[in-house]
């Protein structure tokens, strides 16, 4: 239903705001289409690596900052609980490293914020596990150090990034880089869409869907 503006001469600016809505949402859709057409094989390969990790008794660690921390927690919850209510399956072990405020603040205070995720990766990660790092810039120092630590410990590494992939990209076994710069929002929208597809694929690959 189209709602008409009742103000005189459209002085509320609703037309301008409607144009902004259209512009933002269409750009977001085009960005997702670009990533889907370019990286569908990489996204499927990421899901395969995660499914193999679970089949072999490993767990998935996830990390990111700000909105990316929220995305990491979001995806960890869908792996641990389930993605869709129509799927009945066992819990899958996934841990978002941004959820323990005591550990995060102790690490930031004692070691520095750049070290918080690497320290938790050292604590929880074991050979055969997998770390997924999220960074809209591709340059988050604490995510970078977590992936470096993960590799040293024998974990597989995945990354969802933005821009040109930044300093993190070379440290991921597989990475999807969203070609957007200047703000985190559109990149995060792509990351969560990719994450949802990955979780759906993992459930299917493991025979649950």
From Swiss-Prot:
Alphabetized GO MF terms: carbohydrate derivative binding; D-sedoheptulose 7-phosphate isomerase activity; zinc ion binding
Note in the entry: The reaction produces a racemic mixture of D-glycero-alpha-D-manno-heptose 7-phosphate and D-glycero-beta-D-manno-heptose 7-phosphate.
Residues where Zn(2+) binds: 74, 78, 188, 196
Matching Pfam families: SIS_2 (PF13580)
Keywords carried by this UniProt record: Carbohydrate metabolism, Cytoplasm, Isomerase, Metal-binding, Zinc
Organism, as annotated: Chlorobaculum parvum (strain DSM 263 / NCIMB 8327) (Chlorobium vibrioforme subsp. thiosulfatophilum)
Cofactor detail note: Binds 1 zinc ion per subunit.
Pathway membership, UniProt: Carbohydrate biosynthesis; D-glycero-D-manno-heptose 7-phosphate biosynthesis; D-glycero-alpha-D-manno-heptose 7-phosphate and D-glycero-beta-D-manno-heptose 7-phosphate from sedoheptulose 7-phosphate: step 1/1
Swiss-Prot/TrEMBL catalytic activity: 2 D-sedoheptulose 7-phosphate = D-glycero-alpha-D-manno-heptose 7-phosphate + D-glycero-beta-D-manno-heptose 7-phosphate
Obligatory cofactor(s): Zn(2+)
Compartmental location: Cytoplasm
Subcellular location, principal: cytoplasm
GO biological process, one term: D-glycero-D-manno-heptose 7-phosphate biosynthetic process
Role of this protein: Catalyzes the isomerization of sedoheptulose 7-phosphate in D-glycero-D-manno-heptose 7-phosphate.
Annotated SIS domain residues: 50-209
Record-stated family: Belongs to the SIS family. GmhA subfamily.
EC number: 5.3.1.28
GO terms under cellular component: cytoplasm
Residues involved in substrate binding: 65-67, 78, 109-110, 135-137, 140, 188
Highest classification ranks of the organism: Bacteria, Pseudomonadati, Chlorobiota, Chlorobiia, Chlorobiales
SUPFAM superfamilies named in the record: SIS domain
The UniProt record lists the keyword Lipoprotein: no
Record protein name field: Phosphoheptose isomerase
Broadest EC class assigned to this enzyme: isomerase
């Amino acid at each position: 239903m189209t709602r008409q503006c009742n103000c005189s001469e459209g002085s509320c600016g609703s037309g301008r705001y409607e144009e902004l809505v259209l512009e933002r949402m269409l750009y977001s859709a085009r960005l997702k289409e670009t990533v889907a057409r370019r990286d569908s094989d990489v996204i499927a390969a990421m899901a395969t690596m995660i499914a193999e990790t679970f089949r072999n008794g490993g767990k998935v660690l996830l990390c990111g900052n700000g909105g990316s921390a929220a995305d990491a927690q979001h995806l960890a919850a869908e792996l641990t609980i389930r993605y869709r209510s129509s799927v009945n399956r066992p819990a899958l072990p996934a841990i978002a490293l941004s959820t323990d405020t005591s550990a995060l603040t102790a690490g930031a205070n004692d070691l520095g914020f750049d070290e918080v995720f690497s320290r938790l990766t050292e604590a929880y990660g074991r050979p055969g596990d997998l770390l997924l790092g999220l960074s809209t810039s591709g340059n988050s120092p604490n995510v970078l150090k977590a992936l470096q630590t993960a590799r040293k410990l024998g974990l597989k590494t995945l990354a969802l990034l933005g821009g040109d992939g930044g300093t993190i990209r070379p440290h991921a076994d597989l990475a999807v880089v969203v070609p957007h710069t200047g703000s985190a929002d559109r990149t995060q929208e792509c990351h969560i869409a990719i994450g949802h597809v990955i979780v759906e694929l993992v459930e299917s690959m493991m025979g649950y869907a």
